[in-house]
Regions:
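C-terminal amphipathic/interface module of NAD(P)-dependent oxidoreductases
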Residues: 286-298
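Hydrophobic alpha-helix immediately C-terminal to the catalytic Tyr-X-X-X-Lys motif of short-chain
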Residues: 158, 162, 166, 196, ...
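Conserved mid-core alpha-helix of short-chain dehydrogenase/reductase
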Residues: 68, 109-113, 218, 223-226, ...
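C-terminal "lid/loop" region of Rossmann-like NAD(P)-dependent oxidoreductases
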Residues: 211, 239-242, 250-257, 264-282, ...
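Hydrophobic "lid"/C-terminal helical patch
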Residues: 22, 228-232, 256-259
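N-terminal Rossmann-like NAD(P)+-binding domain of SDR-like oxidoreductases, especially those catalyzing
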Residues: 1-182
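Residue-level signal for the nucleotide or nucleotide-sugar donor/cofactor binding architecture
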Residues: 64, 95, 102-105, 150, ...
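Glycine/proline-rich active-site loop of Rossmann-fold NAD(P)-dependent oxidoreductases
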Residues: 157, 182-195, 202-204, 209, ...
Length: 298
């Protein structure tokens, strides 16, 4: 193996949407050796980075299985870890709560192995879901209470607590990214933005749960990756947390109407019964920290 790499970086979940885009950003730097681990449950090898530098390795493995992931840590001396592996998607996580809770094993495995192998910092993909049904607008990283109820949100919340605990007890540095809705070309078809776009471009009905008054904000993947890479390369957000999203709030109904308009679609909007749980009424992050990462004022 080339010993000239300045940083050896593990990206778990690196065959997923956000993880693969992050891995591509890291692999664009020839000084980085990027090791991607994914169990391909929802990820795809088609999303893996393309690079001329021969600095990417893909290993199919499950971070929730200690034997799987420990052998990878022993084979590489990682400098940094981006732990992005997780079961995602509202309907998928609601339907598989035990599988979601198993992701706690992966968090423990990553932190234990990182602590014992000299990893300098662990970067963790948390979620806006930790805020639950928010009690403050916009949601601020340090003042808005976390209100997690569903297994996915609880796992992300507990994951954050693990990171803080490993720093407090063992000095393992961390950075937490709380991702709000993110969209882009590699996104799976079962997320709201890509689902609406696919329906509109095929003149199929666009289905909305409830009356569509629930709000979300949508962050383009490039902004997400730029913010995270700036934190990494500039050594920012050490032992801290940042919302990664957009602060333009939009109802799901308005999103559907806008997509129909810009695609010149003949799609009709069809309303389905509201989800019993998991569909929060509002989401809007305070992105002051993210704007600082991107060196933007607006």
């Amino acid at each position: 193996m080339n010993s000239s790499f300045q940083s050896r970086i593990l990206v778990t979940g690196g065959a997923g949407f956000v993880g693969s885009c992050l891995a591509q950003g890291l692999a664009n730097n020839p000084d980085n050796l990027v090791i991607i681990v994914d169990n391909l449950l929802t990820g795809s090898e088609n999303k893996l980075p393309i690079t001329p530098y021969n600095n990417v390795r893909f290993i199919k493995a499950d971070v929730n299985d200690f034997n799987d992931i420990s052998s990878i840590f022993h084979a590489f001396s990682f400098d940094y870890v981006f732990h992005y592996a997780a079961l995602v998607g509202v309907k998928r996580t609601l339907a598989n709560p035990v599988m979601v809770l198993n992701d706690l094993n992966g968090i423990r495995n990553i932190l234990s192995l990182s602590k014992n192998s000299g990893v300098k910092r662990v970067y963790y993909s948390s979620s806006s879901e930790v805020y639950g049904e928010p009690v403050e607008f916009p949601q601020n990283e340090h003042t808005t209470p976390l209100n997690s109820r569903l297994p996915y949100a609880i796992v992300k919340n507990v994951g954050e607590a693990y990171l803080r605990s490993y720093y407090q007890e063992y000095g393992l540095n961390f950075t937490i990214f709380r991702f709000f809705n993110t969209y882009g070309p590699k996104q799976s078809a079962d997320f709201v933005m890509s689902k609406f776009l696919n329906s509109a471009m095929n003149n199929q009905d666009i289905t909305i749960y409830g009356d569509g008054s629930q709000t979300r904000t949508f962050c383009y993947i490039d902004d997400n990756i730029d913010a995270c890479l700036n934190a990494f390369y500039n050594d920012l957000l050490v032992n801290d947390v940042a919302n990664i999203g957009n602060d333009y709030e939009l109802t799901i109904l308005d999103l559907a109407r806008k997509i129909i308009e810009v695609t010149n679609s003949e799609s009709k909007i069809v309303f389905l019964p509201a989800l019993k749980e998991g569909d929060m009424t509002r989401r809007c992050p305070d992105i002051t920290v993210m704007k600082q990462l991107l060196q933007r004022k607006t």
